[in-house]
Amino acid sequence: MDPLQAVHLGPRKKRPRQLGTPVASTPYDIRFRDLVLFILEKKMGTTRRAFLMELARRKGFRVENELSDSVTHIVAENNSGSDVLEWLQLQNIKASSELELLDISWLIECMGAGKPVEMMGRHQLVVNRNSSPSPVPGSQNVPAPAVKKISQYACQRRTTLNNYNQLFTDALDILAENDELRENEGSCLAFMRASSVLKSLPFPITSMKDTEGIPCLGDKVKSIIEGIIEDGESSEAKAVLNDERYKSFKLFTSVFGVGLKTAEKWFRMGFRTLSKIQSDKSLRFTQMQKAGFLYYEDLVSCVNRPEAEAVSMLVKEAVVTFLPDALVTMTGGFRRGKMTGHDVDFLITSPEATEDEEQQLLHKVTDFWKQQGLLLYCDILESTFEKFKQPSRKVDALDHFQKCFLILKLDHGRVHSEKSGQQEGKGWKAIRVDLVMCPYDRRAFALLGWTGSRQFERDLRRYATHERKMMLDNHALYDRTKRVFLEAESEEEIFAHLGLDYIEPWERNA
């Protein structure tokens, strides 16, 4: 997900500490009129309650200073449902059966999403029906992070797309991306690891106490988390989003074929817009960059799943024309369950193909598309794979399989969707496609590597090296102690060799 699209960071306003009764509500626009919230001060404190009330109002929620008949939701922190009912009884207030008793994590998620989120079981405060409403050990539905030790390795964590901490991870992803654009490798990795571990948590962070025992959260990261808890936003991420260099590099590298070196050059030359770059006669562009500019509007828009499925059919139809027994697998984010992406990746292999047939397939397929008028751009990198070469020691090493970077013309009629991101008046869309051809005996390693996520693969290789004395890449797994290559016909076998529980593709969104 593009962090620029994923996070909404409003203006940061430092507030002095408040004492005493919370101030009256300020005249913010109420966007969600069906919900009337009351935030319970018990176990929360006056200052934090006042801050949360103010923040919720800024986000468009109606929050009452006092409990009244109009309240539909009571939100509490570190209280069980029984605690809340006991408090209501002490106030001589009878709770309506329609009144929702919710943990503060629900409101935090609402504010992160900018709208009310669905009330799940984990949000509902538990009321013990068999006793008077008093504190009952274990009855409250407040998540506890230290139930089980959390691994520092993403390959030992299950990370689905259900991110309870997006407010934090979006900010950390922006900071990581900024460091990557500046080639600050150490800081970038620290932010990426922190974001990755937060994405795996089955509960939302609502206070700094929740971060206790969680690995990969250094002092800098904890400071950022604390700032977001207090202010509802990250001043550091906001500063990056407003930074001219960051905005320029993001814009320039959004062009297919433009890397950091070219972006740096254009920035130093004083360019800030793509139109100025395209109109400058002194600049020379590669064929890839020319294609990137030509189809920019299509390529910069996300590919949705119906479009990816249509491309998958296009690829399979072409491949089996020349290799009927070939196996074509969609990899990358779409294999991990994502609904959108910036390109579509495919791994191709064949159990019966000769080495020559493997080497010729991508050439035949791209020639076939060229004859059909579907090939808008093509760059084939020939294989440099060596069967008995040990895996790379680098956790980010690229593989040596034959691969093809394409832009294909996807006709609107092939997409089974009401909306397919087409430009109005145009019957097709340019789609970025990567094809990888690998030998059949290496398919498991290639599939594991090309599925991602990037952080999952990095940690998988790091785990193999540091914990198992093995070397893993997209080609092979090598045991340095026994000095042998370990064969595998499936991803499950690779996990077994490493002594790891198998992680499904949709649980690798680290």
Curated annotation (Swiss-Prot):
Tissue expression per record: Isoform TDT-L: Expressed in the thymus, and, at lower levels, in the bone marrow. Detected in both cycling and noncycling pro-B and pre-B cells (at protein level). Isoform TDT-S: Expressed in both cycling and noncycling pro-B, but not pre-B, cells (at protein level). Not detected in mature peripheral or germinal center B cells.
BRCT domain location: 27-124
One BP term from GO: response to ATP
Domain of life: Eukaryota
Motif (Nuclear localization signal): 11-17
CC annotations in GO: cytosol; euchromatin; nuclear matrix; nucleoplasm; nucleus
Region ranges (Involved in DNA binding): 258-262
Cofactor note: Can also utilize other divalent cations, such as Mn(2+) and Co(2+) (in vitro).
Consequence of changing D473A: Nearly abolishes enzyme activity
Catalytic activity: DNA(n) + a 2'-deoxyribonucleoside 5'-triphosphate = DNA(n+1) + diphosphate
Cofactor list: Mg(2+)
Impact after mutating L398A: Nearly abolishes enzyme activity
Binding-site residues, a 2'-deoxyribonucleoside 5'-triphosphate: G333, F334, R335, R336, G337, K338, H342, D343, V344, D345, G449, W450
EC number: 2.7.7.31, 3.1.11.-
Residues annotated to bind Mg(2+): D343, D345, D434
Sequence segments annotated as region (Disordered): 1-22
Family: Belongs to the DNA polymerase type-X family.
UniProt subunit comment: Interacts with PRP19 and DNTTIP1. Forms a ternary complex with DNTTIP2 and core histone. Released from this complex by PCNA. Interacts with TRERF1.
Annotated protein name in UniProt: DNA nucleotidylexotransferase
Organism the protein comes from: Mus musculus (Mouse)
Gene: Dntt
